[in-house]
């Protein structure tokens, strides 16, 4: 099985909160798709709460679109990581890490402005697969933590695992 790009970087050296360009690719028509690793917590040290990350999933995608979409950028999807340390964001375009970080900060400020649980988009059994698993309070605590810490940039060349280590860690 081919090694996924996200597993070629050293998770023990990742800063968080931080933005990282996880992958770029060209479509057959020439558009650039960029995938960003939006790392909220340090891997293997902390995880986002189940209800908090789920509520953020509902809020964050819309708020990020409000702050990042434009003539040269269109967000395709923002999805939580299975390890619950952040989100992956796929988009058309090539915004800088700083543009993404600025949008992320603005989105976290928006999360803090949500006044009540009933203001969470699509929080109902028709549009959400686990409508009971939400906590605005936990999502707002995550947002506050991001705002308090600030958002830095993780660079792939600084995090790359050596080829010898990738071979050593490989399971056939």
From Swiss-Prot:
Taxonomic source organism: Vibrio alginolyticus
Any Pfam family matching the protein: LuxS
Residues binding Fe cation, per UniProt: 54, 58, 128
The keyword Cell division is annotated on this UniProt entry: no
Disulfide bridge map: none
Cofactor(s) essential for the protein: Fe cation
Cofactor: how bound: Binds 1 Fe cation per subunit.
GO MF annotation: an example: iron ion binding
Keywords on record: Autoinducer synthesis, Iron, Lyase, Metal-binding, Quorum sensing
Enzyme Commission number(s) of this protein: 4.4.1.21
Keyword Hydrolase: no
Coiled-coil ranges (or none): none
Enzyme type, top EC level: lyase
UniProt record similarity statement: Belongs to the LuxS family.
SUBUNIT field: Homodimer.
Catalysis performed (reactions): S-(5-deoxy-D-ribos-5-yl)-L-homocysteine = (S)-4,5-dihydroxypentane-2,3-dione + L-homocysteine
Gene Ontology process terms (BP): quorum sensing
InterPro entries with a match to the protein in the record: LuxS_sf, Metalloenz_LuxS/M16, S-ribosylhomocysteinase
Protein name, entry field: S-ribosylhomocysteine lyase
Role this protein plays: Involved in the synthesis of autoinducer 2 (AI-2) which is secreted by bacteria and is used to communicate both the cell density and the metabolic potential of the environment. The regulation of gene expression in response to changes in cell density is called quorum sensing. Catalyzes the transformation of S-ribosylhomocysteine (RHC) to homocysteine (HC) and 4,5-dihydroxy-2,3-pentadione (DPD).
Source domain of life: Bacteria
């Amino acid at each position: 099985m081919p090694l996924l790009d996200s597993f070629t970087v050293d998770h023990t050296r990742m800063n968080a909160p931080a933005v990282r360009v996880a992958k770029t690719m060209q479509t057959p028509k020439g558009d650039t798709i960029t995938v960003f690793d939006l790392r909220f917590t340090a891997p293997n040290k902390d995880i986002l709460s189940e209800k908090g990350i789920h509520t953020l999933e509902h809020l964050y995608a819309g708020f990020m679109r409000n702050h990042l979409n434009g003539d040269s950028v269109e967000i395709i999807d923002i999805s939580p990581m299975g390890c619950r340390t952040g989100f992956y964001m796929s988009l058309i375009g090539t915004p800088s890490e700083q543009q993404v970080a600025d949008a992320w900060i603005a989105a976290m400020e928006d999360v803090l402005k949500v006044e009540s649980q009933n203001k969470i988009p699509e929080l109902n059994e028709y549009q959400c697969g686990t409508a009971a698993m939400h906590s605005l309070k936990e999502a707002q605590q995550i947002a506050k933590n991001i705002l308090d810490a600030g958002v830095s940039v993780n660079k792939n060349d600084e995090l790359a695992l050596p080829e010898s280590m990738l071979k050593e860690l490989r399971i056939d």
